[in-house]
UniProtKB/Swiss-Prot annotation:
Keyword Signal (UniProt): yes
Residues spanning the signal sequence: 1-18
Subunit details: Equilibrium between a soluble monomer and a bound lipoprotein form. Apolipophorin-3 associates with lipophorin during lipid loading until each particle contains 9 or 14 molecules of apolipophorin-3.
Protein name per UniProt: Apolipophorin-3
Length: 189
C-alpha cells in the first residue's frame, strides 16, 4: 500500500510539474496540483498518527490490527502494481521507463513487507518501521516518476492521467481505512 502511495504520489507530482512547464497547458493541471498537495499532507498525517498509535496501551489489539492492515496493504500494493503495468502499455519513452522502474520498486517494497509480515505480532516495532519505510519509498518513487513523466506531459496527461488519478484515489481511500482500523484498535478501552 505504501509503495503504491509513493508511486502514485510521484506520478502526480510529475504530472503537476509538467503542467507548469507549458504556459498553454490545459487547466487540468490543477487537479494534479491538488492531488500532489493532498498526497504530501496525507503522508505527513499518516506518519504522525501512525507514530502516536504505536504507544497504544492495547498492544494485543493494535498488533492484530497492524497484522490485518498489513494484509490489506499487501493486496493494495499488488493492485497498484497492476495499475502501473496497465499504464506502462499506454506509455512510451522516458515515461514508460519511469513507470516500469516505479512498478519494480513497488513490487520490491511489497516483497519486503511480505517477508516481515509473519512476525508482526512478535516484532510490531520493527514491522511498523518497515510499513512506514514502504510509505516513504512509495513517495520517493512517485517523485522520481513525476520528474520523468513531466517531460512528456501532453501525451502522458491524455493517456496516463486518468489511470494515475484512479490508482492514487484508490490507494488513499484504502490507506485511510487501514489508519482508521489501527486508530480504533489503539484507542479501544
Amino acid at each position: 500500500m505504501a509503495a503504491k502511495f509513493v508511486v502514485v504520489l510521484a506520478a502526480c507530482v510529475a504530472l503537476s510539474h509538467s503542467a507548469m512547464v507549458r504556459r498553454d497547458a490545459p487547466a487540468g493541471g490543477n487537479a494534479f496540483e491538488e492531488m500532489e498537495k493532498h498526497a504530501k499532507e496525507f503522508q505527513k498525517t499518516f506518519s504522525e498518527q501512525f507514530n502516536s498509535l504505536v504507544n497504544s496501551k492495547n498492544t494485543q489489539d493494535f498488533n492484530k490490527a497492524l497484522k490485518d492492515g498489513s494484509d490489506s496493504v499487501l493486496q493494495q500494493l499488488s493492485a497498484f502494481s497492476s495499475s502501473l503495468q496497465g499504464a506502462i502499455s499506454d506509455a512510451n519513452g522516458k515515461a514508460k521507463e519511469a513507470l516500469e522502474q516505479a512498478r519494480q520498486n513497488v513490487e520490491k517494497t511489497a516483497e519486503e513487507l511480505r517477508k516481515a509480515h509473519p512476525d508482526v505480532e512478535k516484532e510490531a516495532n520493527a514491522f511498523k518501521d518497515k510499513l512506514q519505510a514502504a510509505v516513504q519509498t512509495t513517495v520517493q518513487e512517485s517523485q522520481k516518476l513525476a520528474k520523468e513523466v513531466a517531460s512528456n506531459m501532453e501525451e502522458t496527461n491524455k493517456k496516463l492521467a486518468p489511470k494515475i488519478k484512479q490508482a492514487y484515489d484508490d490507494f488513499v481511500k484504502h490507506a485511510e481505512e487501514v489508519q482508521k482500523k489501527l486508530h480504533e484498535a489503539a484507542t479501544k478501552q
